[in-house]
Design a protein with these regions (language model features):
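Bacterial Sec-dependent N-terminal signal peptides
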Residues: 1-30
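Short, intrinsically disordered, charge-balanced linker/junction segments flanking boundaries
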Residues: 4-6, 245-250
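A generic structural signal for short, non-catalytic loop/turn and secondary-structure boundary residues
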Residues: 20, 107, 130, 193, ...
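Residues in and immediately flanking transmembrane alpha helices
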Residues: 22-23, 68-70, 130, 216, ...
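Ubiquitous "structural anchor" signal
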Residues: 26, 135-138, 177, 184
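Acidic/His- and Gly-rich active-site-bordering loop/insert found
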Residues: 28-168, 189-194
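Acidic/histidine-rich catalytic neighborhood of metal-dependent amide-processing enzymes
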Residues: 156-248
Length: 250
C-alpha cells in the first residue's frame, strides 16, 4: 500500500508537544487549546506547504531530488526563525547531508534533538494503485482500502480527520519533518516558550540504512551535544492512536 498521511488535527503539532513540552503543555489546558486552535486555523497553509514538500522526489538514486528536498527543509526552518540552519556533511564526499537548526532558550537547562529523515524508499509503480502517482500528492475522502475517493484539496483550508493524502513519504518520513517544524511554529505563534533548547536533525540516508550517519555525528559532535534525542519515525500502532516508545532492544 502506498504511503498515506492521516489528517487527524492533532497529528501535525500536538504529538510532538506531548514529548517535547510535557511540562509546559500537559499541565496547562489553555496551551493545549491554543495549539489546537492554531493547527485548525492554519490547516490550509500547513497542508499547502506539505504537498509542495511531497512533490519533490527524494529517493536515494535521485541526488538532485535529495538536494532540492534538503533545500526545501532549510527554507521551512528559516521561515520559522530557527537559527544556525545548515547542512551537516559526512567525511565521505557526495553523501546526502543532514539538515540542522537550533533554538536556544535563555535559562534552559536541557537540550533535546528532534530527529526525522527526508529520504524515501524506492518507487515501484507496479505496487501503486492505478490512480496514484508517487510525487503528485492526492487527497482522498478516506483510506483507499476503505473505499476512499479522490477529492480536491479544499479552497477554504478546512480538512476532515478521515481524509488522507497519498504520495511517496507522505508518512515515512516527510510527515515527521513537517510535524516537528509545524509543532514548533504552533508553539511560538501561540505565544508559548519552550522549556528547553531545541535542535533539529533531519537525515538523508535512513532508507539506505544510515551508512554515513556515524560520520556525521562524529564530525559534528560539538554541535550535536544534547541531553536526549527524540526520534519522530516508526510504525503506526494497529489502533491508529499516536504513541511514544521509550526504547527498543538492540
Amino acid at each position: 500500500m502506498p504511503p498515506k498521511h492521516n489528517f487527524m488535527r492533532k497529528h501535525i503539532s500536538f504529538f510532538v508537544f506531548s514529548c517535547l513540552f510535557a511540562q509546559l503543555v500537559a499541565a496547562q489546558s489553555p496551551a493545549v487549546v491554543a495549539i489546537r486552535d492554531y493547527s485548525n486555523k492554519n490547516a490550509g497553509t500547513i497542508i499547502n506547504e506539505f504537498t509542495g514538500f511531497l512533490a519533490i522526489p527524494n529517493i536515494a538514486a535521485d541526488t538532485a531530488g535529495l538536494q532540492k528536498t534538503a533545500a526545501f527543509i532549510m527554507d521551512m526552518m528559516n521561515k520559522r526563525g530557527i537559527k544556525k540552519v545548515q547542512l551537516l556533511n559526512a567525511v565521505t564526499p557526495g553523501v546526502p547531508p543532514a539538515v540542522y537548526g537550533e533554538v536556544m532558550v535563555p535559562g534552559a537547562k536541557q537540550t533535546l534533538i528532534f530527529y526525522a529523515h527526508y529520504d524515501g524508499q524506492p518507487v515501484n509503480p507496479a505496487q501503486w494503485a492505478k490512480e496514484l502517482t508517487p510525487f503528485i500528492p492526492k487527497l482522498f475522502s478516506q483510506a483507499l482500502d476503505k473505499g476512499g475517493m479522490n477529492i480536491s484539496f479544499p479552497a477554504d483550508g478546512k480538512y476532515n480527520n478521515d481524509w488522507r493524502i497519498y504520495a511517496r513519504s507522505a508518512s515515512d518520513d516527510k510527515a515527521g519533518v513537517a510535524a516537528i517544524l509545524n509543532a514548533y511554529d504552533a508553539l511560538t505563534k501561540s505565544g508559548l516558550t519552550p522549556g528547553c533548547n531545541i535542535k533539529f536533525f533531519f537525515e538523508g540516508e535512513e532508507e539506505a540504512g544510515s551508512p554515513h550517519l556515524g560520520e556525521i555525528l562524529q564530525k559534528h559532535s560539538a554541535l550535536l551535544q544534547s541531553d536526549q534525542w527524540i526520534m519522530c519515525d516508526g510504525p503506526v500502532h494497529q489502533s491508529g492512536k499516536k504513541q511514544i516508545a521509550f526504547g527498543v532492544r538492540g
